[in-house]
Swiss-Prot record:
CDD domains: CYP82 (cd20654). Pfam families: p450. Its EC number is 1.14.-.-. Its cofactor is heme. This is Cytochrome P450 82A3. It comes from Glycine max.
Amino acid sequence: MDLLLNCLNLNTIAIASILSLIFLCLFLYRKNSRGKDAPVVSGAWPILGHLSLLNGSQTPHKVLGALADKYGPLFTIKLGMKPALVLSNWEMSKELFTTNDLAVSSRPKLVAVEVMSYNQAFVGLAPYGPYWRELRKIVTFEFLSNRRIEQRNHIRVSEVRTSIKELFDIWSNGNKNESRYTLVDIKQWLAYLTFNMVVRMVVGKRYFGVMHVEGKDKAQRFMKNIREFMNLMGTFTVADGVPCLRWLDLGGHEKAMKANAKEVDKLLSEWLEEHRQKKLLGENVESDRDFMDVMISALNGAQIGAFDADTICKATSLELILGGTDSTAVTLTWALSLLLRNPLALGKAKEEIDMQIGKDEYIRESDISKLVYLQAIVKETLRLYPPAPFSSPREFTENCILGGYHIKKGTRLIHNLWKIHRDPSVWSDPLEFKPERFLTTHKDVDLRGHNFELLPFGSGRRVCAGMSLGLNMVHFTLANLLHSFDILNPSAEPVDMTEFFGFTNTKATPLEILVKPRQSPNYYETL
């Protein structure tokens, strides 16, 4: 009997030991497969987290770039009570967009996004799902496809040439120095040009210049609203990190957002009613139809998801105007600033245009493919000064592993493009303006989201759909300006490159330059 009990005890101990070993192996396997948590930046405040880090005098992308040097390419900060993963490395970007793209294809519902984008009706800020897929398909086909871009070629050509003619008139009537140069605010000129170009394509109106068809006061007010819109859209409110404090509206940001959104919606509603009346009166000519005309017909009063046709039409039109005007003008301003600081590169660009186009000849959009150095200038500008130093906000919708770290569902993503674009392990002399790198060591690097060391338009499912149109406008405008005018820095000091962080990364100060015609008077008179 004792022998039997001893045998049973030994069997029990053996089974228990085996089970314990199995459970230990399973625990270790799950722990290893789960991955460890990414490093967390120290110094978080109770409730507010690391918000104080992002509200200092230095721009947020530079602050987080410096933290990446300390904590590595993946680390976590707390935006109030919300965890956010900061990604600052091209290898991690590649892993993210090739392995976990679906998990990070949605957008967080921030206060600015809710209040100012018609509650996430913007296709670029909508959560990933059926509404986003359906609307992106319509917008791409009706406005951003190569066929539609080519159909609206005459608008872009007309606006650029008209603006060049107006700049020539400013020179003709302005005060000239001993070298016959005239001082102009080129940053403002670019803002008006890109605004006219995009607004004509979207709603068929021209607001600025000698050929404007709307009241100047109305135009200036709308431009002011747009600038405020972009600044407010880039504002991270305390309520975004601590939702329970939203009712306090600390800083008054939400109040300002609502006031701005109301003003902008008022004009959009006017445009929509004008287009609807034009359709009822049969005044729509197929060749003259703008994007709002097309959207009214395409939607035909139908609802998509939770949004009615009017809301979709207004939201999408506004989004195209915002995205097309601000990022284009910002990129052109940085490009000219860099060229004025680098006269050798400016000289090479003009030499290429002279050789490929010729004196007193007009540039066509089809000529841009021959201007390879000019394209390299634009790439280098987008590397050093991407219009959005952080890609648009994303949120993980499921748990995943990235770089060996466990990322929890609900974590927000801050993708620091500015830091990635200045990685010394990828780019030699990363802080220097060297367009030649895109003709030699990086000649195969494109901007379409497949080369993860250069992602000014993002990557994956949420890559910027307006990339082709935006590049088209930047290349064509820059080529025409450099072909038509000699430009100089009016100061003995280098051009100020101070940045102002908002929804886009703008130049904080005006860009005043000296201009003088490069072509004969007849060239400008027949534009």
